[in-house]
A protein has these predicted regions:
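Vicinal oxygen chelate
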Residues: 17-19, 24-32, 52, 74-93, 98-169
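A short, acidic/glycine-rich surface segment
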Residues: 57-62, 95-100, 140-146
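Short hydrophobic alpha-helical segments enriched in small aliphatic residues
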Residues: 5-7
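Core segments of cupin and vicinal oxygen chelate
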Residues: 30-83, 148
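Short, Lys/Arg-enriched N-terminal segments with co-localized hydrophobic residues
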Residues: 9-19
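Conserved long hydrophobic alpha-helices within structured protein cores
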Residues: 39-55, 85-91, 122-137
Length: 169
C-alpha cells in the first residue's frame, strides 16, 4: 500500500459540471518490435498481457497525423484494478521509426515508474536478465515535504526507454 497521499487542489470542469480531465487512462510507448517488448514487459517485469489491437483506417490516420498509418497496439498491466493505467505499447507498421537516445534532461516524459514491495529482488532479477540498470537502488527521504521515504532506480527497456522502479518505505 502506498503511503503517499495526493490532494487535488483545483478541479477543472466543463460548463455542465462534467469533469474535464479524469484519471490517467494509459501510458503509451512507441516500440520498434512489439513482440520483443511484450516479452520484456510480461516475462521480465511480470505485467499481465491484456490484449492487442490493430489500428488502421481514417481515424487512425487522423489521430497519428500520418496517411496510411497502421499500428499494432498491446496493453499490459500489473494490476487487475480498472483504476491502474496500463502500459500501451505501439509498433507502427510500414512507417520508419526514428530511434532517439532517451535524455532525462530533455523536455519529454522522463520515465514510466513501477511500484514494487521488494526493490532489491527486482533489481537482482533485472541484472540476471541482462537489463541495463542506470544505478543500484537509491534511498530518498522527502518526509519533510510530505512525500515520505522510498528507494528507487532507473533502468531501460529493449528500445532504451527509461523506466523507474520504486519501493515506498
Amino acid at each position: 500500500m502506498l503511503k503517499h497521499e495526493y490532494v487535488v487542489k483545483q478541479k477543472i470542469t466543463l460548463g455542465g459540471g462534467l469533469d474535464m480531465v479524469g484519471r490517467i487512462y494509459h501510458v503509451g510507448l512507441t516500440v520498434s518490435d512489439l513482440d520483443k517488448s511484450i516479452a520484456f514487459y510480461r516475462d521480465i517485469l511480470g505485467l499481465k498481457f491484456q490484449g492487442e489491437i490493430l489500428m488502421v483506417g481514417e481515424a487512425t490516420d487522423k489521430i497519428f497525423c500520418k496517411e496510411n498509418c497502421k499500428a499494432r497496439v498491446a496493453y499490459l498491466n500489473a494490476s487487475e484494478n480498472i483504476q491502474a493505467p496500463p502500459a500501451e505499447l505501439i509498433q507502427f507498421i510500414d512507417n520508419e521509426i526514428r530511434k532517439i537516445e532517451p535524455d532525462l534532461f530533455a523536455t519529454s516524459i522522463s520515465e514510466l515508474c513501477f511500484y514494487t514491495n521488494d526493490i532489491d529482488l527486482v533489481y537482482e532479477d533485472l541484472i540476471k536478465n541482462n537489463v541495463e540498470c542506470l544505478s543500484e537502488p537509491q534511498y530518498f527521504d522527502f518526509s519533510s515535504d510530505g512525500f515520505g521515504k522510498s528507494r528507487a532506480f532507473y533502468f531501460k527497456d529493449p528500445d532504451g526507454i527509461v523506466l523507474e522502479m520504486m519501493q515506498p518505505l
